[in-house]
């Protein structure tokens, strides 16, 4: 065969232009067809695509292209999550206008995405930094505000001194800023929050709806983040003042073992103690110093299991309401004000953290759960006892198995009026305020007369000024911009001040998938009919790093909007795939390691189709992929081999066309192309004349189409699908060596094989497929064609290989007719010369045939 090569440098841009000009990927609501919404997490416009992007988007594009060919009405959009700190940092460091910087980066990345041949409907692109998008982000904030789901309060927040902004709990990793790695400190600020805790139970409960569609790891991560705990709330009393100090515990069965209480340094009772004159000034000074030290530690640093437990005695005691015993009141680093009640009972005998704290500070240990052997002695303990046991030293509950005692202790507290059963959550309300300028402004004004006033919807958007002064110092540039800050009150018309915080960029990305359904709408964020038709997203693909952040917030938004009557779905993403990373030499790609691979360079050298093929072939999508130069070269070789196979088969294809009547109503037929139906009809008539080689190639082709269809439809086994495509290619080459294209039956068989192969490669290598489809005479794009069909009867093998075992060891392999009975299999196996020689002179105990697979012969002697 001629060494003809696929000229990707000429063909790929040409097909991209044609797809764009013809708008073949544009999509509208169509109630007559099943819909499929395929979505990749949209990128931040950093300016350059990296291989992680390419892998993510290629996975989704293959899914989208396959579903289109299967007859689905496919929504496959793209946009840019374009607010955030990198643009602002560029403005600070280089004097760039963040809007211009963002726009230029988007243009560059859009060109790169088009180079990859992705089948996006670009008319639906969304850009979160544009007014036509953030207007609706602000509108949604106002709806949350009306429902009491957006509120402002002063709270200790995570503060990044480098980024000069507040971070959500989820954005603090090991005590450091997730973006710049600076140590995070605490700061008291008035902040805006979304009341996500109001949906905690539903967010937790509805994870069950995602079983089978979402990775178990992601569901567990969200479950742990929400952190629902059932237990009891019990009120202890500060002996000196009578103040009640509530605690939350999941172990009320141990409450008789309390020997101390620990409160967070920020707890209101600490301030009261320090200002009441109840303790000496030197102790007050020590407490103040301890509080100041804690301000510079993040929650992660304070609560880490590796962190040393630090505490300070307040000098006062609390009274245990169950037994009237006194317990010392301490403050400690490991108790947080925003988890539970900010106060924790100390039971060192039955909680390891409490035990370590008691050991360090010489606090008493009291056993109240005895082990089955009855051998626990407080003075002999080297660790807390946390296993089940019998309640002791517990008043009326002595002798009760502790697990049975939990509800009894709670009931007693409720009867006595000092406690009740309750549920606590690890999840905190979502802090959305950011002291940065490059974000969606919060649509609130402050009036001395009217107080906090929401901006009327008719006045949206609250626009970002074009002339902000980005120095990187002194908080947000918005707060220093008098033209932005000073405004008039919408209620009284008097002077007012705008809110200068912007919204966390995760607010923008919590609803973008809804805007894609109706992105040009200037009257509302989306049309209800469109959003109800397209939602939920059928397949979402993105990194595992978003398991808690983005995915939890998007679920929360969807549930709130459902309750407002704006959407009907309970969950936004029916199925989730978290793709693995792209590695080089076994390590994550990074500039510092010098192991990055540029997508642009790879496209220039090998073509987009070869890059796509390698990425989909090298590893299953959920696993990490190690970039291989040999692998991409192999993919490029296969692209050319496939191209040569089809081009060399064109004479046979044209001969097959000449054998069948032309349909004058079909442009493809007139231009020399064949439809699947025409080929099938021709082969049905030619069936009596097919040779064994003809039938075998047809069997391989139909069986492989069946297998690849299952690989793509059911399990996203892209690598095995490509392996099947390679098997088809090898089978066609082998057939060509044996058969003559001028023979009528051979021409028809080859035409069928080549046509199905080109259709199957289309989702993976879209440019190559369209180029070959065009050369075969088809006037319209292959991406508008249906997925190839397969015939179950044709796919069946005439013969199968069975294994013959003797006492479990393989002794022979035999070709037998497909569909052979168990009795016939036994007879064939026993007739084997190898088997007869091995069983000669031995007693045959039994013969166990497994139809279509094996015969096991059990012998003795």
From Swiss-Prot:
Entry's Gene Ontology cellular component terms: cytosol
CDD domains according to UniProt: Anticodon_Ia_Leu_BEm (cd07958), LeuRS_core (cd00812)
Pfam families reported for this sequence: Anticodon_1, tRNA-synt_1, tRNA-synt_1_2, tRNA-synt_1g
Keyword Iron on entry: no
UniProt-annotated binding residues for ATP: 591
Alphabetical list of InterPro entries matching this protein: aa-tRNA-synth_I_CS, aa-tRNA-synth_Ia, Leu-tRNA-ligase, Leu_tRNA-synth_edit, M/V/L/I-tRNA-synth_anticd-bd, Methionyl/Leucyl_tRNA_Synth, Rossmann-like_a/b/a_fold, tRNAsynth_Ia_anticodon-bd
Gene3D superfamilies noted in UniProt: 3.10.20.590, HUPs, Isoleucyl-tRNA Synthetase, Domain 1, Valyl/Leucyl/Isoleucyl-tRNA synthetase, editing domain
Chain location of the short sequence motif 'KMSKS' region per the record: 588-592
EC number: 6.1.1.4
One GO term (biological process): leucyl-tRNA aminoacylation
Reactions mediated catalytically: tRNA(Leu) + L-leucine + ATP = L-leucyl-tRNA(Leu) + AMP + diphosphate
Top-level taxon: Bacteria
Residue positions of motif 'HIGH' region: 43-53
Family: Belongs to the class-I aminoacyl-tRNA synthetase family.
Name of this protein: Leucine--tRNA ligase
Organism: Symbiobacterium thermophilum (strain DSM 24528 / JCM 14929 / IAM 14863 / T)
């Amino acid at each position: 065969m001629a060494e003809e090569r696929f000229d990707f440098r000429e063909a790929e841009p040409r097909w991209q232009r044609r797809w764009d000009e013809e708008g073949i990927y544009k999509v509208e609501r169509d109630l007559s067809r099943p819909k499929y919404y395929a979505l990749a997490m949209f990128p931040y416009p950093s300016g350059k695509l990296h291989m992680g992007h390419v892998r993510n988007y290629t996975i989704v594009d293959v899914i989208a292209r396959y579903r289109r060919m299967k007859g689905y009405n496919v929504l496959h959009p793209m946009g840019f999550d374009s607010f955030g700190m990198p643009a602002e940092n560029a403005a600070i460091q280089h004097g760039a206008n963040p809007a211009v910087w963002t726009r230029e980066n988007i243009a560059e990345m859009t060109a790169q995405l088009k180079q990859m041949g992705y089948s996006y409907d670009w008319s639906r692109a969304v850009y979160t930094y544009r007014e036509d998008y953030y207007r609706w982000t602000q509108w949604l904030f106002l709806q949350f505000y009306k429902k009491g789901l957006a509120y402002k309060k002063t709270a200790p927040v995570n503060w990044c001194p480098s980024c000069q902004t507040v971070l959500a709990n989820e954005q603090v990793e090991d005590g450091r800023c997730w973006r710049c790695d600076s140590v995070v400190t605490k700061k008291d600020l008035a902040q805006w929050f979304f009341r996500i805790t109001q949906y905690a139970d539903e967010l937790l409960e509805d994870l069950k709806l995602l079983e089978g569609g979402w990775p178990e790891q992601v569901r567990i991560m969200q479950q742990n983040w929400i952190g629902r705990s059932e237990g009891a709330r019990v009120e202890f009393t500060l002996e000196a003042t009578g103040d009640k100090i509530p605690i939350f515990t999941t172990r009320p069965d141990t409450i008789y073992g309390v020997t101390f209480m620990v409160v967070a340094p920020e707890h209101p009772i600490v301030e009261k103690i320090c200002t009441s004159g109840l303790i000496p000034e030197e102790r007050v000074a020590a407490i103040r110093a301890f509080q100041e030290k804690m301000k510079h530690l993040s929650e992660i640093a304070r609560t880490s299991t590796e962190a040393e437990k630090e505490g300070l005695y307040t000098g006062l005691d609390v009274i245990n309401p169950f037994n009237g015993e006194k317990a010392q009141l301490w403050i400690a680093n490991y108790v947080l004000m925003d988890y539970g009640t900010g106060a924790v009972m100390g039971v060192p005998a039955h909680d390891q953290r409490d035990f370590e704290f008691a050991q360090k500070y010489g606090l008493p240990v009291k056993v109240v759960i005895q082990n089955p052997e009855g051998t626990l002695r407080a003075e002999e303990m080297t660790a807390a006892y946390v296993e089940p046991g019998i309640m002791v030293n517990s008043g009326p509950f002595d002798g009760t198995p502790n697990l049975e005692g939990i509800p009894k202790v709670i009931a007693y507290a409720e009867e006595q009026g000092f406690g009740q059963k309750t549920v606590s959550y690890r999840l905190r309300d979502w802090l959305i305020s950011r002291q940065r300028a490059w974000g969606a402004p919060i649509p609130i004004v402050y009036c001395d007369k009217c107080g906090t006033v929401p901006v009327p919807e008719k006045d949206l958007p609250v626009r970002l000024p074009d002339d902000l002064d980005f120095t990187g110092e002194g908080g947000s540039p918005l707060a220093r911009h008098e033209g932005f800050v000073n405004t008039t009150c919408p209620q009284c018309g008097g002077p007012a001040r705008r809110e200068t915080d912007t919204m966390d960029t995760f607010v923008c990305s919590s609803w973008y998938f809804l805007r894609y359904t109706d992105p040009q709408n200037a009257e509302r964020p989306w049309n209800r009919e469109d959003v109800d038709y397209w939602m939920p997203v059928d397949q979402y693909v993105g990194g595992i790093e978003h398991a808690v952040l983005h995915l939890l917030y998007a679920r929360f938004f969807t549930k709130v909007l459902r309750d407002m009557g704006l959407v009907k779905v309970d969950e936004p993403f029916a199925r989730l795939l978290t793709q693995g990373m792209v590695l080089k030499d076994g390590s994550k790609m990074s500039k510092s390691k010098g192991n990055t691979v540029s997508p642009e360079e790879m496209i220039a050298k090998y073509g987009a189709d070869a890059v796509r093929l390698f990425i989909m072939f090298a590893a299953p999508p959920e696993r990490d992929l190690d970039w291989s130069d040999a692998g991409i070269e192999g993919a490029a070789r296969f692209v050319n081999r496939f191209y040569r196979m089809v081009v060399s088969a064109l004479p046979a294809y044209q001969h097959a066309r000449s054998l069948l009547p032309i349909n004058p109503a079909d442009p493809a037929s007139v231009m020399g192309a064949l439809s699947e139906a025409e080929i099938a009809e021709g082969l049905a008539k030619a069936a009596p004349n097919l040779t064994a080689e003809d039938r075998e190639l047809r069997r391989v082709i139909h069986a492989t189409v069946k297998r690849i269809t299952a690989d793509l439809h059911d399990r996203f086994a892209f690598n095995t699908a490509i392996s099947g495509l390679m098997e088809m290619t090898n089978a066609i080459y082998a057939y060509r060596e044996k058969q003559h294209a001028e023979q009528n039956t051979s021409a028809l068989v080859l035409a069928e094989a080549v046509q199905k192969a080109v259709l199957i490669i289309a989702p993976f290598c879209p440019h190559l497929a369209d180029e070959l489809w065009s050369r075969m005479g088809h006037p319209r794009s292959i991406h508008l064609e249906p997925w190839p069909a397969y015939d179950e009867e044709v796919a069946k093998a005439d013969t199968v290989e069975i294994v013959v075992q003797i006492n479990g060891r393989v002794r022979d392999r035999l070709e037998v007719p497909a569909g052979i009975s168990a009795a016939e299999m036994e007879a064939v196996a026993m007739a084997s010369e190898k088997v007869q020689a091995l069983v000669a002179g031995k007693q045959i105990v039994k013969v166990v045939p497994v139809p279509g697979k094996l015969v096991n012969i059990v012998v003795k002697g």
